[in-house]
Amino acid sequence: MIHNRDQMSLSSKERLIFYKVSIMDNLSERIKSELLEKADPKYREFHSGLVPGTENIMGVRIPELRKIARSAAKEDWRNYLEKCCPDTYEEVMIRGMIIGYAKMDDEERMQYLNRFVPEIDNWAVCDSCMSTYKFMQKKPEIWYSYLRQKVEEGTEFSIRFGVVGLMDYFINEEYIDRLLKIFDKIQHEGYYVKMAVA
């Protein structure tokens, strides 16, 4: 830790970098601390059975993760998303939720989602984070195209991400025929794709 006297000898650019790193460390540490405080071993055991093969589950319930993510989305969330290397299932979930809760334009949100979607390795992160992406309803044509592209990427969880988003926000008279055509064309043997389209 740099003490105040040491900070005085830093240039303004160095002080800004130090300040941003301190904030990120504080936010990251606060999130880790809250997760430890809210972790429930019984829930961890139960939830581990729902997401087989997923490691590093702490056992924090989804409503608590949403509270943490909403709070983080009011702080220096950009720095957090850029620098954070999630160690736990819950930290990955929080990153995805922050993308939904933070205020940003569509282009920036797409950039963060493009980095986040490849990190998804289970249905729960995919579906829980998608439910925070209500912004997709505000500009449906942009987000319909984006989700269609995710389906076309062809990986198990990019397809699921696209399908779940289309089902959450685009099942209406305007889009239903298009969705059915997209779903009919999906040829993927992944279990979580099949369950999303079923």
Task: List each model region and its residues.
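Short intrinsically disordered, low-complexity coil segments enriched in acidic
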Residues: 1-6, 196
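N-terminal leader/targeting segments
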Residues: 3, 10, 23-26
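Intrinsically disordered, low-complexity segments enriched in serine/proline and basic residues
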Residues: 6-18
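Alpha-helical scaffold domains
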Residues: 23-198
